Amino acid sequence: MVTAVFPGSFDPITRGHLDMIQRASRLVDRLIVAVMVNTSKQPLFTMTEKVAMISDELTGLPNVEVQAATGLTVDFMASVHATVLVRGLRNEQDFGYERDIAWMNKSLDETIETICLIARPPYAYFSSSLIKEVAKMGADVSKYVPTAVAQKLHQRLGTDQHD
């Protein structure tokens, strides 16, 4: 049985993330979406809120689970007996970053294999950070994040969207 981990801060989860999760879930027996802390960013949502938002969006994927995780990704992977790390690539800048992370992870744990999925064109040009910036200005971001997530995002930012 192949268990994989798809880690991220998911602040918030995007349609691009969800596309990667759906695609990765078809490649492995068990996929764990690991909601992790990004120490270089100040999160908008708590870990508990992010786990709940993501779980709500993944009800149709029986081999996918969502877990909060702290510390090194390789340590979390060892704790859940995962050997495959799934990452997404939007552009060439992502490739360089992900290559370096893959090499570091491999040096920390030889059993880890990293699989990179290329973002599909509709999702290749935005990130959670960019979506938050646009949402702060009051723009509707529901084409980038699920509707329920967009509502929570606007509520948190004080930029509620009215129909």
Swiss-Prot record:
TM ranges: none
UniProt-listed GO biological process terms: coenzyme A biosynthetic process
Enzyme category, top tier: transferase
GO molecular function: ATP binding; pantetheine-phosphate adenylyltransferase activity
Keywords: ATP-binding, Coenzyme A biosynthesis, Cytoplasm, Magnesium, Nucleotide-binding, Nucleotidyltransferase, Transferase
Stored Pfam families: CTP_transf_like (PF01467)
Binding residues annotated for ATP, in chain numbering: 9-10, 17, 88-90, 98, 123-129
Site note Transition state stabilizer, residues: 17
Predominant location category: cytoplasm
Catalytic reaction(s) noted: (R)-4'-phosphopantetheine + ATP + H(+) = 3'-dephospho-CoA + diphosphate
Known EC number: 2.7.7.3
Name this polypeptide is given: Phosphopantetheine adenylyltransferase
Task performed by this protein: Reversibly transfers an adenylyl group from ATP to 4'-phosphopantetheine, yielding dephospho-CoA (dPCoA) and pyrophosphate.
Assembly and binders: Homohexamer.
PANTHER family: PHOSPHOPANTETHEINE ADENYLYLTRANSFERASE
GO cellular component, as recorded: cytoplasm
